[in-house]
Amino acid sequence: MEGKVYIGGEDYEKEFTPKDYLTTYYSFHSGPVAEQEIVKFSLQNLYQTFSTGGVGGDVLIDIGSGPTIYQLLSACEVFREIIVTDYTPQNLQELQKWLKKEPGAYDWSSIVQHACELEGDRSRWQEKEAKLRRTVTRVLRCDVTKTPPLGSAQVPLADCVLTFLAMECACPDIDTYRAALRRLAGLLKPGGHLVTLVTLRFQHYMVGPKKFSGVYLEKEVVEKAIQDAGCQVLKCNCVSLSYSEAYCSHDGLCFVVARKGPSA
């Protein structure tokens, strides 16, 4: 195992391997129970948010999508357009592979089936995949440490900004995290929703043999950063679920839904 700890955008661009990340954390039926339970927790909260929770609209921007699509499986039913983003070209390439059904694309079918089961019909998973592929209209580079985070790309203000397990990895310290959340709030329409999943008390995680670090966050810090970005916290679901110790050092997860104020 390598002794070096990687942190920040340039390290991700050089060292992050999407396939290693996907096989470690998203091998839904063959992987460790802890990782499966976190995917189930994520899908359940997303389903509630985008069905009975009433979050929907025209445009959703997913910030720091990584190489994953599971976080969009419920959202594609209630948004007209989804924009996916990431810092690293290799993650964007992995997303494009799946969107275009190219050879070697990651097989999400078991996770898609679980999402469909939550909606009441496991058998419509292929229809769900097709709908998501139609709904994702753009794949963009993002850097949450810069203003604007989407660079020169022209995007409409969003009804929802989603960011899952990304900000704590992209930000090396709390000040950077707080500034990044303000930038994300700037992508929202007044009254739009911010939906995020955060690993609490995060120290590092493994991608293959490589160790990546980020910012250590407590629940109170997350809530305060969201409020200071001009958003009201509507739901904060913190649980003691954690990844396998061999893969990730943290203590719990926090799923938050917030709404941007009328004048933020």
Curated annotation (Swiss-Prot):
- Residues that, per the record, bind S-adenosyl-L-methionine: Y21, Y26, G64, S65, Y70, D86, N91, D143, V144, F164
Q: In which tissues is it expressed?
A: Detected in lung and liver (at protein level).
Which keywords does UniProt give here? Cytoplasm, Detoxification, Methyltransferase, S-adenosyl-L-methionine, Transferase
- GO cellular component annotations of the record: cytosol
Family to which this protein belongs: Belongs to the class I-like SAM-binding methyltransferase superfamily. NNMT/PNMT/TEMT family.
What is the reaction catalyzed? a tertiary amine + S-adenosyl-L-methionine = a methylated tertiary amine + S-adenosyl-L-homocysteine + H(+); a secondary amine + S-adenosyl-L-methionine = a methylated secondary amine + S-adenosyl-L-homocysteine + H(+); a primary amine + S-adenosyl-L-methionine = a methylated primary amine + S-adenosyl-L-homocysteine + H(+); dimethyl sulfide + S-adenosyl-L-methionine = trimethylsulfonium + S-adenosyl-L-homocysteine
Top EC group: transferase
The EC number of this protein is: 2.1.1.49, 2.1.1.96
The UniProt subunit note reads as follows: Monomer.
Function comment: Catalyzes the N-methylation of tryptamine and structurally related compounds. Functions as a thioether S-methyltransferase and is active with a variety of thioethers and the corresponding selenium and tellurium compounds, including 3-methylthiopropionaldehyde, dimethyl selenide, dimethyl telluride, 2-methylthioethylamine, 2-methylthioethanol, methyl-n-propyl sulfide and diethyl sulfide. Plays an important role in the detoxification of selenium compounds.
Its main subcellular localisation, reduced to a broad class, is cytoplasm
Q: Does the keyword Glycoprotein apply?
A: no
Positions carrying N6-succinyllysine: K14, K97
One GO MF term on file is: thioether S-methyltransferase activity
Q: Which compartments is it annotated to reside in?
A: Cytoplasm
Q: How does activity depend on pH?
A: Optimum pH is 6.3.
Q: Which organism is it from?
A: Mus musculus (Mouse)
What controls its activity?
Inhibited by the S-adenosyl-L-methionine analog sinefungin and by the product S-adenosyl-L-homocysteine.
- Coiled-coil positions: none
For this protein, the record's Pfam families field holds: NNMT_PNMT_TEMT (PF01234)
What name does the UniProt record give this protein? Indolethylamine N-methyltransferase
Keyword Repeat recorded: no
The record's section on NCBIfam families has:
GntF_guanitoxin
